[in-house]
């Protein structure tokens, strides 16, 4: 079977999926994840019919980092039979000012993407590592990069810019926005299952270890909460979200911190983890009776409500609100509390539907429809990859 491999590489996990190329379109064949890199690594994979292919705990010393995780994944993939690999698609967080749509990866493209590593140090190096590996071991297999920033690139300049001298915008200092692959998938899925909603004013909340929200009008990005980097906007697992730049100046000058120390603070020691002093995992915080956990959750929900108001203003009102990603799809308590913050816009939560994990969790008469919709970034990447190799 002709197939595509889709890779989504992070610092602590590696997700990869195989899609068969059929006459009717793409058919998911294998879904795999190697998580707990360097701590409690485990490789799990299932076939399309749900059959477990592997569920193996690995020695942490054998998988201390992403390069070793990639080697483990490569070796396991080599045991699979019946797939004729036609292309590899990758999630790449930052496309900078140059890439506004998915692109076939060549050496010059890879070099350009590497130049954006300082803009996404938590993600970009990990995104590029499997590309380099595949270039070495499968040089004849085309690779495609799909960017989290691309979905937002159609916005107006006055929306994208910062109030800095124009030369900075021309040098690429602008509000890029992220999680675009997820938002693109949700926008397309809404057109399929709720076309009247898709044509309206929609806020999508991608709430996971990384979190942001996006305002959609007729399926297009109008405004989003993240900006130049994936530090901005909502508080996240280990990132602070919106922060007065004066705080950074204070840390550098008055506190005497180095730029690297500030970067480590903002990317690894802030957010839910920093506020609570307990964990970056919302599930753990919700299960804790420690007041610091409640404090972190309160802050997260407060910021969600504030940013939803900003996005509703950008849309001129609100017709629907969609929860997606790890927290959005799975945490009924967080959905309930965020929905409370939307009551002034006309959102009325149906608690029973919310607790049951229904796809629509608003009451029948709610002015704002509340939806829960699983995202599928890997499928979106596979679609773009297939389109590009067919157009060659």
Curated annotation (Swiss-Prot):
Q: Which EC numbers characterise this protein's activity in its record?
A: 2.7.2.1
Enzyme class, spelled out: transferase
Q: Where is this site: Transition state stabilizer?
A: 179, 239
Cofactor annotation = Mg(2+); Mn(2+)
Please name the PROSITE patterns in this protein's record: ACETATE_KINASE_1 (PS01075), ACETATE_KINASE_2 (PS01076)
Extract one GO molecular function annotation from the record. ATP binding
Q: Name one Pfam family in it.
A: Acetate_kinase
One Gene Ontology biological process: acetyl-CoA biosynthetic process
Binding residues for ATP, per the UniProt record? Answer: 15, 206-210, 281-283, 326-330
**Reaction(s) catalysed (UniProt annotation):** acetate + ATP = acetyl phosphate + ADP
Naming one, the record's GO cellular component terms include: cytosol
Residues involved in Mg(2+) binding: 8, 377
Q: Which UniProt keywords apply?
A: ATP-binding, Cytoplasm, Kinase, Magnesium, Metal-binding, Nucleotide-binding, Plasmid, Transferase
What is this protein's function per UniProt? Catalyzes the formation of acetyl phosphate from acetate and ATP. Can also catalyze the reverse reaction.
Subunit description = Homodimer.
Sequence similarity: Belongs to the acetokinase family.
The entry's protein name is Acetate kinase
Q: Gene that codes for this?
A: ackA
């Amino acid at each position: 079977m002709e197939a595509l491999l889709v890779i989504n590489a992070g610092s602590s996990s590696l997700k990869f999926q195989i899609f068969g190329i059929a006459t009717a379109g793409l058919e998911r064949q294998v879904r795999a994840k190697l998580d707990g890199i360097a701590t409690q690594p485990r490789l799990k994979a299932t076939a399309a019919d749900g059959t477990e292919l592997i569920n193996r705990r690995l020695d942490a010393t054998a998988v201390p980092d992403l390069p070793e995780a990639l080697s483990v994944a490569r070796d396991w993939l080599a045991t699979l039979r019946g797939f004729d690999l036609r292309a590899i698609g990758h999630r790449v967080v930052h496309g900078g000012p140059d890439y506004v749509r998915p692109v076939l990866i060549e050496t010059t493209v890879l070099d350009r993407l590497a130049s954006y590593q300082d803009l996404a140090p938590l993600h970009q190096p990990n995104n590029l590592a499997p590309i380099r590996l595949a270039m070495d071991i499968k040089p004849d297999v085309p690779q495609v990069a799909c960017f989290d920033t691309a979905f937002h690139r159609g916005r107006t300049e006055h929306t994208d810019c910062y109030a800095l001298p124009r030369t900075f915008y021309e040098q690429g200092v602008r509000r890029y926005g992220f999680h675009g692959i997820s938002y693109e998938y949700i926008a397309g899925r809404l057109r399929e299952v709720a076309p009247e909603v898709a044509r309206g004013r929609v806020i999508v909340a991608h709430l996971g270890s990384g979190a942001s929200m996006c305002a959609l009008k007729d399926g297009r990005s109008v405004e989003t909460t993240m900006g130049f980097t994936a530090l901005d906007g909502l508080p996240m697992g280990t990132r602070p979200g919106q922060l007065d730049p004066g705080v950074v100046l204070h840390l550098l000058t008055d506190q005497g911190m180095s730029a690297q120390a500030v970067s480590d603070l903002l990317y690894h020691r802030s957010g839910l983890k920093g506020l609570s002093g307990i964990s970056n995992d919302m599930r753990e915080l919700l299960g804790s009776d420690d007041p610091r956990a409640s404090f972190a959750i309160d802050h997260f929900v407060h910021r969600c409500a504030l940013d939803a108001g900003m996005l509703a203003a950008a849309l001129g009102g609100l017709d629907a609100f969609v929860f997606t990603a790890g927290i959005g799809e799975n945490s009924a308590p967080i959905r309930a509390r965020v929905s409370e913050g939307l009551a002034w816009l006309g959102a009325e939560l149906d608690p029973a539907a919310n607790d049951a994990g229904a796809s629509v969790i608003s009451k029948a008469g709610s002015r704002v429809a509340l939806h829960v919709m699983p995202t599928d970034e890997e499928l979106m990447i596979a679609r773009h990859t297939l389109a590009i190799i067919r157009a060659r």
